[in-house]
């Protein structure tokens, strides 16, 4: 038992040391974190879920995504209780993660110096912003700090939107709410707004696994941010989440229509469908191809394994 304890201490000590001395995770690190993903990746190693899939996911509900993830065993993917600039501006994107901790002056100086030696410019809270691509969402763990934990104001907000055309998700604060609100298309999910400046925090990791509330976020996760909260979808599950949610929406639309028409009872629609109802649904799909957010081939393949 003592030997096992020593091994664990050494393992986590080495892991922590390597994370602190490598603020930006290497490509190999990111591939290790996201090994389930087999598709296209960015040069930094992050999974690159397609723009088309991001648009499809933007149309689904938090509950639908949550249900699919929970069914797949991913139970730590949702974070709620946000303040936001606009409640009616949902967004999706690919996570670029960052983690901040309370400042330790000596370590902070060494890490700033190291970052500057590696080509980073200015204060460390601007480094993740410089790395953003179109479609990225800057997701940061600032340990819930709002007062003196304002990761961005309107200047950095403009830089973020210029680079990514997406919003941000911060387990921390932001300032300049009025100015941020003038950035057309931008939204921020934060723990609060405060006029203070960012101080006494330090950046210790970029593109590493982070915690947001009770949720875990990996680099390249698909972010679905809506008024209800934010759900973090592992990249390798994004397509499953999309098509399952889309199927449920089609099923519900068909059910609502048939209930209004009086063709079936609520018990028939809410219970296990009979073969006659299933056939009616398939014929309804044939007559309403414009309602399908996926191809009919994708839907048919999905329904082969569906238990209804």
Model-derived features: where do they sit?
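Feature captures the catalytic cores and cofactor-binding loops of soluble hydro-lyases/lyases
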Residues: 56-219, 233-308
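Buried hydrophobic positions in well-ordered alpha/beta secondary-structure cores of metabolic enzymes
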Residues: 45, 160, 221-223
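Channel- or pocket-lining gating/hinge segments that regulate access to a cavity or pore
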Residues: 229-231
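Boundary at the C-terminal end of the N-terminal hydrophobic targeting segment
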Residues: 18-22
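Bacterial N-terminal signal peptides
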Residues: 7-16
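N-terminal pre-domain segments of enzymes
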Residues: 23-66
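Positively charged n-region of N-terminal signal peptides that target proteins for export
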Residues: 1-4
